[in-house]
Amino acid sequence: CLYNQPLAVGRVMTPVLAMTVVREAAIAAFVPEKFYTVDLELTSGCTASSRRIPEKTVAENLLEACRKEMVATIQRITCKEKSENPPPLYDLTTLQRDANRLLGYSAQQTLDYVQSLYEKKLTTYPRTDSCYITDDDEEMLEELTEELEGFLDIAPEDVDEAVPRTRRTVNREKVTDHHAILPTRSMLQADLDALPKGEQNVLKLIIARTLMAVSKPFRYLETLLTTECAGEEFTAKGKDILEEGWKAVERKVLADILNRKQELTALPNAAENECGILNAELKEGQTSPPKHFTDVICYERGIRNRP
């Protein structure tokens, strides 16, 4: 123990301590391993990558062989339509997770921000473990989301017009004392620029999640291109958007809060049996150790393992 002081560990801290000790031991014992890949820039407009190769000389030999051939044979192209349903409304833990992942806030920071927003009557009660609302709240949420669409300037076609579109957020059995975290109607008239930056960011996450939860699914076409060169397989993946749905809200919020654009890689059509190779490059990588636990991860694991 730090400074050789005894530390009392109760029934709550014991599993957290055990979990942390196991993770730290795994990190301490981890030995990174280098690996190499060969990337081919194809005339079809995409980049295909080889498998991970542990030996550098093998990867270098493959690189030279590809540079000599300068042609890749298309073996197969598979396309599959996929769909991602919108995420549920926020409870405290999922809000803390996203604020940590996107903004670097600790669990306590996020709690402080959302507690302050609640005290200012800008959001509902924050200390909830439910991601749902009850039937009694459905009409309120329906009216609120209509106003939030204009607040975030969301295109109406991105939001689900199913009747009622809020039905997927309703589950009385999963609401205990308090429903999911929502913005309030009074938030729409508030001067949000006067809020501290941390509170502004957390509020934007809550507004965005509220709209995402009632938006259409994200539909896309996933394409996998498999080519062969010098006896080795190379693959490239891409996504073509069919319907952006809730991702439109996520994209807008990420651009606003993080000043970061979210882009998908679409594979161009490769109708020919062969593609020319414009460039072949050797890439070096290294395996990563398990990540250290943060307070947010501990909260998440505690919720997930709760009976």
Regions found by a protein language model. Name each.
Residues 1-81, 175, 179-244:
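Phosphate-backbone binding and catalysis cores of DNA-processing enzymes
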Residues 48, 248, 276-279:
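Polar low-complexity intrinsically disordered regions enriched in Ser/Thr and small residues
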Residues 60-200, 204, 210, 214, ...:
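Structured DNA-binding interfaces in DNA transaction proteins
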Residues 232-264, 270:
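Polybasic, glycine- and aromatic-enriched phosphate-binding surface used to engage nucleic acids
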